[in-house]
């Protein structure tokens, strides 16, 4: 019995997580965050309908991303999903809900009604033939700026000064160093641009890039991302880039760095502040 007494669902223990891989093994690679939870690299929870032969599951990353996979016609599971997502204690101020099939997209529309919006996303994978330009870009840093790989100190500094959500993505600085990596450009010890592993799974790393507003459009994002990609290549990791279909600046940077779009997919997004949703949809020209 879990979360308000739903007696037909079970939350898995961490050493049981791999039981759900069969439910989305053939799904697209954009489920990086889900594999990261299953593989124990990043924190999260997993719920199933049957611990002997599960037919569907909900994977919850501490970052706010969720995945539903398996049988979309399971009425008991769908009731649980609505119940779980309706409780504020089960998420922060928002959630992202991903799916393993087109059937799930329609079912989620039905379950959540008008409580979430459907977004179009683009997934990019890096083209290995672009390595020579990546290496050149990574050594073009202007004087007075420093390019560094993140260590525990820089990770904690980033969490405290730039993006506190990384404390949910990674349980500690040491866990980040153990399972993830990142690069940053500094000037006088202060962050200018940072490229991190947002999510990781075996052999893949999903990129997160942030550049301070006053330093944008000056090439810093290109340089720090190039260093990140070069490290991936040397370590046998495939870099991934995931963004909203309407985010033209992100798509432009991805293509400049040598990423190719390999998938267009849909997911659902909910935020407790409807103005946040409205402004977001306007910003990225989403109807």
Tell where the protein language model's regions lie, with residue ranges.
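Active-site rim helix/loop that mediates acceptor-substrate recognition in acyltransferases
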Residues: 29-42, 161-182
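Conserved beta-hairpin
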Residues: 43-60, 181-195
